[in-house]
Amino acid sequence: MSAVEWSILPGLSPYRETLEAMENRVAAIRAGEAAEAIWLLEHPPLYTAGTSARPEDLVEPERFPVHVAGRGGQYTYHGPGQRVAYVMLDLDRRGRDVRRFVTALEDWVIATLAEFNVRGERREGRVGVWVVRPDRPAGLDGSPREDKIAAIGVKLRRWVSFHGLSINLEPDLTHFEGIVPCGIREHGVTSLVDLGLPVTMQDLDAALLRTFPQHFPD
């Protein structure tokens, strides 16, 4: 099975049930019983803790439900207005290179943002995608402000990937205040709408679909 099956889920997907369904799909892919899959969805407001999450980075533990995700990375927020892409690909077939896979995810996000004339950038030592904010005050050292627009956190099970990435379209950015996103205190978060772009979720999904084959060819 080589074609990737795409699903766009309506409404808000409950986290625990979605994680269980994702784990079942990963097992089916590994067994050769199901095609690779990408699920595009939104969650209700919640925080997830990756395998490197530090207790002190959960600033407001009572604000939203907190889930242990089992993916790589630290704390992140999911909620309405944020597009989550769960990426279930067979790296045994595509190449057993985790670093290359994460880089391809970043490149996919960067290409998607470019569809809206947004320059997303990667940073050494900071997984995810960032945008420079010349419209915001510079840092104490005079360096330009950088805000995170997309987070990436993955897990592999017998070389099938799951979890994936999230892109901030129009979430309530104050919801990120309950955590230190990805353990990075000196940078903020942004979204496409925060950048002044009237992008819809349908626009974003279409861009994700268009740019995917460039970075994950069959």
From Swiss-Prot:
Compartments it resides in: Cytoplasm
Catalytic activity: octanoyl-[ACP] + L-lysyl-[protein] = N(6)-octanoyl-L-lysyl-[protein] + holo-[ACP] + H(+)
Coiled coil (UniProt feature): none
InterPro entries tied to this protein: aa-tRNA-synth_II/BPL/LPL, BPL_LPL_catalytic, Octanoyltransferase, Octanoyltransferase_CS
Domain of life according to the entry: Bacteria
Residues annotated for substrate binding in this entry: R71, G72, G73, Q74, Y75, T76, Y77, H78, A151, I152, G153, G164, L165, S166
GO biological process: protein modification process
Any one GO molecular function term: lipoyl(octanoyl) transferase activity
CDD domains: LipB
Domain (BPL/LPL catalytic) ranges: 32-218
Main subcellular location of this protein, as a coarse class: cytoplasm
E.C. number(s) listed in UniProt: 2.3.1.181
Keyword Cell cycle in record: no
Pathway: Protein modification; protein lipoylation via endogenous pathway; protein N(6)-(lipoyl)lysine from octanoyl-[acyl-carrier-protein]: step 1/2
NCBIfam families to which the protein is assigned, alphabetical: lipB, PRK14341.1, PRK14345.1
Keyword Heme among record annotations: no
Transmembrane segments: none
Residue positions of the active site: C182
Miscellaneous information on this protein: In the reaction, the free carboxyl group of octanoic acid is attached via an amide linkage to the epsilon-amino group of a specific lysine residue of lipoyl domains of lipoate-dependent enzymes.
Stated name of the protein: Octanoyltransferase
Cellular-component GO terms for this entry: cytoplasm
Residue(s) at site: Lowers pKa of active site Cys: K148
UniProt family annotation: Belongs to the LipB family.
